[in-house]
Amino acid sequence: GPNDLAATLNVPLGMNNQHPKHVEAVNKVLEAGKKHNIPTGIHCGSPEEVVERIEQGFLWMPLMSEVALMKTSFMASMKQINEKSKPSELKSDGKFY
């Protein structure tokens, strides 16, 4: 995946890596796949990156890992709850019952 490639190239890790060496290597893989009629894919870190990779010509784009998807969904849910419930205004005596 992208992080394995980044580690091999000795460049910073991260999804949608824009380091010039990483971009060049990803493009090289994509072009080799097209040349030999082999579907190419790349692991993506966001829906926006999936769209970008489709436009680039990739045919297989898994979106995040299961853990990352769960974390992203959880964080969005908690943000919505916190915005609507104003938890700083909640009072508690510390007892469950």
Name each model-derived stretch.
Residues P2-Y97:
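Expand to "…catalyze enediolate/carbanion chemistry for C-C bond making/breaking, isomerization
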